[in-house]
Amino acid sequence: MANPEVLVSSCRARQDESPCTFHPSSSPSEQLLLEDQMRRKLKFFFMNPCEKFWARGRKPWKLAIQILKIAMVTIQLVLFGLSNQMVVAFKEENTIAFKHLFLKGYMDRMDDTYAVYTQSEVYDQIIFAVTQYLQLQNISVGNHAYENKGTKQSAMAICQHFYRQGTICPGNDTFDIDPEVETECFLVEPDEASHLGTPGENKLNLSLDFHRLLTVELQFKLKAINLQTVRHQELPDCYDFTLTITFDNKAHSGRIKISLDNDISIKECKDWHVSGSIQKNTHYMMIFDAFVILTCLASLVLCARSVIRGLQLQQEFVNFFLLHYKKEVSASDQMEFINGWYIMIIISDILTIVGSVLKMEIQAKSLTSYDVCSILLGTSTMLVWLGVIRYLGFFAKYNLLILTLQAALPNVMRFCCCAAMIYLGYCFCGWIVLGPYHEKFRSLNRVSECLFSLINGDDMFSTFAKMQQKSYLVWLFSRVYLYSFISLFIYMILSLFIALITDTYETIKHYQQDGFPETELRKFIAECKDLPNSGKYRLEDDPPGSLLCCCKK
């Protein structure tokens, strides 16, 4: 039989490179030595970074990179957020300015109520918008301009959509309608010097048949440059605004709603020059973004390597357990080798890398995908901060939240599935029955938002008070509907949900005091009594452990 000390040393020296092969014909002593080697290998795998340092002197590179990455990604997000705020503010302020410029008598927060009720008001509104468009250069306080198409400037398109044929006689309760929709359009050039008079004198040659009319649309394009970014050491962007003023008569109710939609696109300015050091600052920011990408790549490689090693060790342990004990490893034990925190960090690294590349392209004015970039960077930063919880979980006093969430998650998911069925039932019922009589129930999305607010105790009285009383039956139903929903979800479902979390929390606290239930995997590892600083985990080429370590317990 081989010398036991030699066999142990051989297995220990190569335990991170290739697995020790187990043969059923091995002698009992060799089998015990192989079991001991497997236990040490598993115990080292599940150690925290501090214990691994004491076991083999391995530096916690992943932890150091995560700390560095948190600082860098957060700084990057803040800088991009400030830039994105200027972009969003410029869009919103221009949209408000256009509404005041092109909608006659418009006042702030009138979007839902802005409408006209007479034919003369419709003509007045159209003529007012056209006149303002033709005089834009003289009246606008912004740097707005017409879009140039070659030597000419883009025109305003006025289109009306109407039924092909229609004879409507409400007095006789008769009508003859052809639902086929036709469209007529004509253009108004910015360089036209024509005078637009009163509706009876207007030279637009626009005639509307209000009985057949569906919509009138005024569409035109304007351009502007966001100069406020210069003060923040950034290159300005050029904006294209596609404006559409819509007169909506689809309901034929005597009320024509007017709305202004602004479709905004950001483009790279063609010919620009800025004095000063703005371009140099842009280069510094791109260098910083490149450093963020390199840091995330290092984190990605280290975490991916750890995940792969975990899968390899999982397969090795499954084979070992099957050959040695003639038993299969349970699925829960196999899942312990898959570190979900590493997978989350890998996802955050990928999002950060893609977002940083987009940010660099935006700074170079090659792309203008601010919204996509903000979603990527925002999500990645959130995941980076969540990933740090893993390292706090190594301390018994800080991992209570993590353990509670992990233990409660399966029951919470099952509970939420059942509660969601009741919630959706109330959503559909409220939308169908109360939608015509209550503004908060006009769409499924608004119904869901309203009911979720009620669960949290928000806006209860106004939800009751705003219910129209035109139909006593529906009003009575609304009371039964709202009272039953509030009672069911607040006093029963929400209380049960909180009790579910509380029960799990108490169970975890009990486990921390008396010990957690041990699985087959943990029982197998627990038979290894070697401490991390015993020296038995060290490989032949490992450096001696430093006596100075902040992780010493």
Swiss-Prot record:
CDD domains per record: ELD_TRPML3 (cd21072)
GO BP, sorted A to Z: inner ear auditory receptor cell differentiation; locomotory behavior
Motif (Selectivity filter): 456-459
Keywords from the UniProt entry: Cell membrane, Cell projection, Cytoplasmic vesicle, Disease variant, Disulfide bond, Endosome, Glycoprotein, Ion channel, Ion transport, Lipid-binding, Membrane, Transmembrane, Transmembrane helix, Transport
Disulfide bond sites: C159-C185, C238-C269
Modification after translation: N-glycosylated.
Keyword Ion transport part of the UniProt annotation: yes
Taxonomy of the source species: Eukaryota, Metazoa, Chordata, Craniata, Vertebrata
Protein name: Mucolipin-3
Bilayer-crossing regions: 63-83, 284-304, 342-362, 372-392, 415-435, 476-497
